[in-house]
Amino acid sequence: MSFKEISTIRAIAMPGMTKTFCYSLLTLAIIEAVSFQSAFAAESDLRNEQSLVVTADTDDDSASYPARAYTVPATRAGTKLNLTQRDIPQSVSVLTRQRIKDQNLQNVGDALANVTGISASQNDSERVDFYSRGFYINNYTYDDIPSTQTGAWNFGETDSDSAIYERIDIVRGSTGLMTGTGNPGAAINMIRKKADSKTFAGDLSASYGSWDNQRYVADLSGPLNDSGTLRGRVVTGYQDQDSWVDRYHKRKKFLYATVAADLTENTTLDLGYDYQSRNTDGPTWGGLPLWYSNGSKIHYDRSDNPSADWTHYNILSRKVFANLTTNFDNGWQVRVNGTHTESDFDSKLLYMTGYPDQTTGIFDSNGYGYAGWYKGLRTQTAVDAYATGPFEMFGRQHQLVAGVDYSRQRNRYLYSTSILSPAEIGDWNSWSGDVAEPDWPAWLLSSEDTIRQKAGYAAARFSLTDPLSLIAGARYTQYSAHGTLADTEKNNITPYGGLVYDINENYSAFASYTSIFQPQTYRDQQGNYLKPVTGKDYEAGIKGDWDNGDITASLSMFRIEQENLGQIQSNRYVNNSSENAYKSSKGVVSRGVDFEINGAVTDNLKLTFGATRYVAKDADGDRTNPYMPQTSLKLFTSYTLPMLSDLTVGGGINWQNRTYKEAINPAGETERVYQGSYPLVNLFARYQVTRELSVQGNVKNLFDREYNTNPAGGVAFNEPANYSVSVNYSF
């Protein structure tokens, strides 16, 4: 049985319309949005009737799964070889379109916060960092093209709207083979929606929720000519919301458009454009001060906002991308991907530091308000080309992928800062944000850098025996960074190796190894870049799948050894900027275990349940990044009632253990500030009114648990209990 036949059996048909007069509507939308407009399926086999093996790449792994599934039959995560999760010797999680819809995960950050083994550190209202296995995640890829995020500046990567993505793949552990510099925490691959429909179809949604949160999204797709060889898709949306935080208001607009052209029977060209704009008034910057000058803790309301009335945070991102795919009759496939991104931000911010008097609310002589006006521009250009397919050796079939890539990132950051005295701030106990905007001094250059990566990579999956396979590969990377604060060139070879042994038709054991090489964009207080992170990553475990891959499970143990890992220094900044200062740690070791089960347990019940426990310490025995939880549990379920098939209900719980940070108290002593363990409970229900129309309700933080989202510094509160109601019309 071929992979296409399996996909056909598994597919759930989407309601559609074939009226050709609808072509013009989509054509106009595509032409308006995209100004640059200019199949062979490999054979597969089955382990048995209940377990799927993918032995070669299909032309599009992102579209080959049922619309309402929580799993996918195959993914290129980690190696670019199109494999089942059982055949990948690393921990892999998948968030499908249906899971994102059920849980109402409106941006990438919301999605990542609900992934097994990933934890969030919400620095303030606009900036959130993600960690896995004790390490900061900075590898984000778009359709397999790497893009590095820095912790210093926020260009909105994690606030990118989820409506434009078909799914999100996550590989925990080092992925240097495919992403270049290897981050040992995790790599996030966002797979964009494609123009793959040959009939006109659409999805319209509107939602309203707490704090006047209004959201409208349209997703239209269909053919642009009679034969369907030219297709288009547009996803656009608008969101406007207040917040539980006083004086905070946010507006978001996005437009995503893509066209696909079948140049021949075996060659397809995809072109696309992604525009995202976010404008925020009253954003917070860091956390609220912890103590009064007498050493007593300050008790805040969740609504307290330390920002001034004149503050804002505006982000604009534009991406253009292209993909050319050719499938050959011998099962080989060649892909060339390219993207160009221009992102900029403009932010006026205010941060309070020091200790106010408990009675008068006036900050002590060491306290002040730090006002900053920041502008940044980042351009990224990346090209990736690779070939993949089967080959025969020693009488057995194997798979190979080989490719080259190039990326260039240019960054330019400007700043202007001013100090507000305690007298200008006034009584902190009655702070309302009503303070005069400073007379900003002339712009100064914070940094201007160009980072380049050139690489070649290759990996092969060797079928050693019927149950045993070996994945081996390597990547050669040339890395350079030149600019105002960096002038370095590094070359590195990153090896990768993994074994997978099929125990029986449902279970496999695996083990893998890869080295770590991560040049750091972190800087110390003097503005010097930290040395590259180096190390090793080991992982071993067991995986299973059932019902043709509809449900998957994994249990893995890992050990990560690192040198020169950058750790944040509380209340320390680079050259008086808003950039957090870091220091290098020696001999960091993270070891632990994670578990996940995901998919359709029955015809009516889908769930994702994952748990992670790790311990990360440096050579002195000190805990690494102690503000991140070392134990976490995440559960989400969706259940369609058998007696009332139009009603689906579900929910979940996220739990994490106690964390702490070290801060300087008014006595000048280092004090540990703890955040206790907490659970968050979420619920949802959806009723299918007609075949096309559905209504859904979501409740977040059902029991209104309160905690500090900024464990690395200050106080910032999580969102209280809140709701949303959405109406969705599909055709």
PLM features: residue spans?
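Extracytoplasmic beta-strand/coil segments of soluble accessory domains associated
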Residues: 70-93, 109-146, 166
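Outer-membrane beta-barrel translocator/receptor signature
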Residues: 148-149, 164-166, 177-255, 263-267, ...
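Short acidic/polar hinge/loop motifs at secondary-structure boundaries
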Residues: 120, 129, 145-172, 191-192, ...
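Membrane-embedded beta-barrel scaffold of Gram-negative outer-membrane proteins
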Residues: 325-329, 333-339, 343-349, 509, ...
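Acidic/polar loop-and-plug regions of large Gram-negative outer-membrane beta-barrel proteins
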Residues: 239-243, 256-327, 342-378, 422-445, ...
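C-terminal beta-signal and adjacent terminal beta-strands/loops
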Residues: 656-664, 683-731
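Gram-negative outer-membrane beta-barrel transporters
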Residues: 467, 583-664, 703-706, 726
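Structural signature of Gram-negative outer-membrane beta-barrels, strongest in the C-terminal barrel
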Residues: 262-264, 378, 397-409, 447-562, ...
